[in-house]
Amino acid sequence: MVKQKHVCVIGAGVSGLAAGKAFASRGHKVTIVERSGDLGGVWEPARAYPDVQTQSPKELYRYTDKAMPKSYPEWPKGPQVHAYLRDYARSHGLDGAMRFDTRVEAMSRRADGRPGWTLRLRSTDGATGHEDFDFVAICTGQFNEPQTLPLPGEEGFKAQGGQILHSSRYGDADLAKGRKVVVLGGSKSATDIAVNAVNSGASEVTIVFREPVWRIPYFVGGLVNFKRILYIRAQEQMFASWGIGPAARLAHAVAKPLVWANWRGLESMLKMQLKLKRCNMVPKERIEDGVNCSVPIATPGFYPMVADGRIKAVRGTFDHYDGKTIVMSGGQRVAADIAVLAIGYKLGVPFLPPEYQAKLVEPDGQYRLYRLIANPDLPDMGFVGFNSSFCTVLCADLAANWLVRYADGQLARQPSAAEMNDNIAMMLNFRRVERPAAGVYGGLCVAPYHFKHFDELLADIGTKTWRRNPLVEKFTPPDADAYARYLATAPDYKAAA
């Protein structure tokens, strides 16, 4: 019999909701703590910049047990995603489990000798308290604390009326109207904000980035939805993955010329479609060498605006501020009223005790997580949403279903600590030696190996999987409804008080 646990889920974003639902559905008592005043994570209205929308199509950016409304466009806007998440929480009875405006300051092993953790919590009114939990699901993900970039001269820049803000704080399009906007970064949020600033009437818009990267348009060649290219098993199998034998390696070697030609063809198409040479934004890196979770979607209008000068593109980074001017690393000087730092988020779990931090993160920043979910040296704890991908919600959903069974000892393939550590060592070597591109974000990215990752999780859970037409399945994106059917075949159980 599985004993009921009191589970603390840290974070009420996409991953936290998945974890809360998974543990509650198995009979556990769940408390979800969220430092902000609303659910949604990056989709919380206070954090979402104007015109933000999903990079993934709606049939992929969803939970297995709830589709997005048919009325939504293929790539839903921020308010629509937030409404979907709110409805998901409500439909699974999670509203009563949420505690907003509550930050986890620290955690330590329980003093009463029982399994679990004691969390020190602080609310926005300054009140603090300690609470014991039997299990902790960390769902803060990779987009938690905004990165900062302290530079000389920034106080003088602000004193003259300049504004410096992280992209997550660019919440009002009117902010740009009639002003000089400089955006630092090469991510989709950077190009989204640059385009929004132009459309909002900014007097000048400049985007600053180190090197151009490959961006994928929503429709490759203007015709083919990119999900038919990036999200299919056939594409994934062009990359040699971990744990393959001699026969599979030989097959990859034989197919290498065809795979090479495939990528060169895609590069040529992107150069023509996006006019990369005209924009002087042809990447140096081969496209296949950089396929990971950082591959951005091309913001509609971005390249045309660069081509006609509405957006000025500068290579480099900020060096310092000089009055109302930003001086770049290459010496260029750009006048600015607003500096938007689209430089991402800090990766880490700051409330974890130092001795456990060392067990979680390698000296080179790589995370030690089995299936990107659990570490045998961090007992009574797991991570959801640290298996980032092109289909984030589906990844979080499957990870949450895996984690609750792992916590309850109910996986069909329940791993031993030795098995977990051996697998972690193998995956670390794969990221460092065989595919360095897999090491981005601390190695917390399953792209382009979505299907292999999902296959491993389902096999561990003990689901029955069947494919009516394996050939068709090889050329179609992941089907969330199919994964719901697979999960329904796993052994059922309920925790008891």
Language-model-detected regions and their locations in the chain:
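Compositionally biased, charge-rich terminal segments
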Residues: 205-253, 429-437, 447
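Non-catalytic, mobile gating and regulatory segments of ester bond hydrolases
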Residues: 165, 425-431
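Short, well-structured alpha-helical segments that form the helix of a local strand-helix-strand
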Residues: 419-424
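Flavin (primarily FAD) cofactor-binding/catalytic cores of flavoenzymes
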Residues: 2-51, 55, 67, 72-219, ...
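N-terminal glycine-rich dinucleotide-binding loop that anchors FAD/FMN and/or NAD(P) in oxidoreductases
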Residues: 47-69, 226-237
